[in-house]
Amino acid sequence: MYRIIRKVVHSGGRGNYLPRVLPKVRAAILSIGALQHRNFRLFIAGQFVSLCGTWMQSVALSWLVLELTNSTWKTGLVSFFGAFPVLLLTLWGGAVADRVDKRFWLMVLQTFFLVEALALGILAWAGMITVPWVYALALLTGVVSAFEIPIRQAYLVEMVGKSNLMSAIALNSSAFNLSRVVGPALAGVVNATLGPAACFFINAVSFFAVLIGLYKIDPREVRSDQSGRRAGLRAGWDHVRALPLPRALVILTTVFTLFGSALIAILPAFARKALGAEVGGYGGLMSAFGIGAALGALTLAAIGQRFQRERVAFIAAIAVGVSLLLLGLVHVFAVAVVLLVVAGLSMALNAIMTNTILQTSAPDHIRGQVVGLYSFIVIGLAPFGSAQASWIGEQFGPSFAIALGGAVCLVAALVMAWRNGLFRPRPDVGPLARMTGEYPVLDSPDGQGGGR
């Protein structure tokens, strides 16, 4: 096969365009700064495989609980128990991330996830799985996630450096969202043919990919913080609160977590009750959301430096609100797929820009705490979003819950965008700022703009 490919590439005539195209493709890939680092390539490859398995488990588990209980509320509680420990522990986890050997502890914590998936598979295969077992394992997984998430996020900058951080975050998000396409699609097939236990076992095996990637990372090429500086648990919050742009984005992220992202918790009920779909259709909706998010993440990974970061964040936030509001009003599967693509793309753009602005504004010795604060909001508050969306979906229907959440997100996005000058003309701040995207926030008296 290799010889055939070489022959085609080096052949003349009509096929001689390949030697001209392939270097351009290679150059485009290498232009993504984070991929120039071997350690990051190992990390992201393992992450992608593992995340595909994680999404397979997530889809199969949600559908299993829905079949066991026939309750939107009890299905949403899986997300609640998985995320509630993050609310309690992730700020502490962020402080720990600033102090520990991140590679070693990531390997330890990923091993726990492997054991949890294996336990679910054994229980399901033996016919012993019950809703209390699901809740208990979700709770234990949440405890580990409270430490794993800030450690993993803070490890990105150590692998690629601050100048390539946005592309690393975008590629990490791309892996997450591409796996959201692949995982649910595979789960729909595997769950329908082999049952949920197979999905859980596949997830357990997938963790070996990320463990191998972490093991092969060369620690000599990792730029860890050697300053020795330490800060209290409030340092991350105090830093964000002092800067106008990060403060606004944190407020907006809080609203999105409580009223926007909660749609994932009630998507199984929306698929069945509003669209008349079964597990295959639910997997298709999840994949549509993942396709949109992956498109947004890959776009920013490739050309994100060309955009004004805060403008992208706020425009994407407005698009999230509009797409969710419309999604709650439709009952046609094809239209719902299109709207979920838009919602996924917009959420990814907003999340990546927010995460990048927060991390690049933070000094090295408190970056873990800033990431911990972000995780506290995005994951720790998610149980409350899932709970309120599930309760409203139970009382008034999943369509109403999604439309209401979209309306709240839209109002919040418009208010924050207006307060941060999105609808006012920008001054000409020079060619360097236009090239790098380092624009000041107009309503910031000191012109700092949140450290972008």
What role is predicted for each listed range?
Residues 154, 158, 200-228, 417-432:
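Helix-loop junctions on the cytosolic side of multi-pass membrane transporters
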Residues 25-85, 242-287:
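Helix-loop boundary and gating motifs at the non-cytosolic
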Residues 7-10, 88-92, 99, 115, ...:
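C-terminal transmembrane bundle of multi-pass solute transporters/carriers
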Residues 44, 60, 76-79, 106-107, ...:
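Hydrophobic/aromatic positions within or immediately flanking transmembrane alpha-helices
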Residues 41-58, 81-97, 101-116, 133-192, ...:
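Substrate-agnostic recognition of the 12-TM MFS/MFS-like secondary transporter fold
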